[in-house]
């Protein structure tokens, strides 16, 4: 599974090649890749077609692009997911996007995925329970210290 530094490298690369581009076409080649988008592949592709991708963001190991209408395209790489640019689809390609260039979402083990999620205060609703990264602008060190001092639990449970 890609660790946080690798996901940040992916975010940086995607930012350069996807931010501000419009999705002209989407194809879902494997339904498991969008399993969290319960409305299915037809709805997923219809809602994304013509959308302009905003800047790529990351919270934990999740990536997202804000879209108009207070929604976001959210992705998680799972154990083997990757985005490839200007490549031919292969046997592990799960979703393709045409944005002037071709962007592929490949996932050999299909543990990763993509979905659309409403934004609340700029954050996809599925990610509201994930704390900000210590290097993020919204990280409040004093609040974290106060929370840790007020609880008697293993660190991971905080």
What are these regions (language model features)?
Residues 1-59, 64-71, 77, 96, ...:
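Extended, highly charged segments
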Residues 73-158:
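Phosphate/anion-contacting hairpin/loop surfaces
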């Amino acid at each position: 599974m890609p660790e946080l530094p690798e996901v940040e490298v992916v975010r940086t690369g995607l930012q350069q090649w996807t931010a501000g581009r419009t999705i002209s076409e989407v194809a879902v080649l494997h339904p498991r890749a969008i399993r969290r988008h319960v409305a299915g592949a037809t709805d997923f592709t219809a809602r994304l077609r013509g959308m302009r991708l905003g800047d790529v963001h990351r919270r934990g190991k999740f990536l997202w692009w804000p879209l108009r209408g207070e929604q976001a395209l959210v992705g998680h790489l799972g154990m083997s997911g990757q985005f490839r640019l200007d490549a031919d689809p292969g046997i592990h390609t799960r979703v393709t996007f045409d944005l002037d260039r071709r962007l592929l979402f490949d996932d050999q083990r299909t543990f990763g995925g993509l979905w659309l999620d409403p934004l609340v205060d700029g954050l996809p609703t599925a990610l509201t329970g994930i704390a900000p990264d210590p290097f993020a602008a919204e990280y409040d060190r004093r609040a974290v210290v106060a929370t840790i001092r007020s609880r008697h639990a293993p660190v991971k449970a905080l």
